[in-house]
Amino acid sequence: FLGAESPGFELNDLGRLSSADDIDSEFFVNYRETQPGKVFRNYRLGLATANGWNFGGTRTYSVVRINTNQTWKNWWNSYVGIFYRPAAMSDDLTRGGPLMATVPGGGIDAQVFTNEAKNIQVGFFYSASWNDLGASANSVRLNFRARPGSRWQFTVAPSWRESNNARQYIGVYPGGTPATYDERYVFSWVKQTTLSMQLRLNYSFTPGLTLEAYAEPFASSGNFSQYGELAAAETTTLRAYGTDNTTIAQDPSGNYVVTDGNNGQTFTLPNNNFNVLSYRSNVVLRWEWRPGSALFFIWQQNRESDCSAGYD
């Protein structure tokens, strides 16, 4: 696969384009064994690579991935994938500012499912990633599905995720050095923890009258720390606030006041810590009162509580 969007390319009303000035390539090769063996009924091995450049010839990302999935003799299914990202230059981390270096990193993800033909099926997902700055992410999800009878089925899927991002963009402020074109591109460390659960229930009263219900409680919190500004274009190094002749302190409102002793400038960074609780649900009663004609009765609710001034 090879695709490109030239600088200044606009889709307007034709669709959505997240970025332009991109040249993207993808290559993948798979080996599939379909003859049952002593351990597996079938399996697949895959190798894939993806690369991106801008029209100036700067490599903006690369990734190499190896993955495999298997169907076992007992009809269980499993998957394992490993990926590696070498260093590159990002043209979007500074949100329209200078290029910023990215560091090498990698990750792994795996899943296993029991036999889906059974009345009870259990699935487990795990993923982890990391990079040379010390950033990391770990997530776990459990999927439990049961069919107690021919009329109904329910699914419970709790999940947990914790991430540590070493370069979370905060904003751009005036007063930077010539190395960053006289602007301050401010970043921070953010630790985020998320808990959620998906609940589904399907029930058939008759072939023409069915009930489908979905609910998802959700909780997430984030803590921002270790603020600093990009030291120079095409690097990943931050000039950490509180060092290098700078000070940082919280004011009574909880925001952070930064003073640069080199030029005497003072500016304020918002306190972006957040705690969010939400609950979404959807219930649909479908009645096919005659062949080809159906009535739907839908009840939805979406509740959210932001316990602090969060960060978007």
List the predicted regions and their residue ranges.
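Exposed, low-structure sequence patches enriched in small/polar residues
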Residues: F1-D312
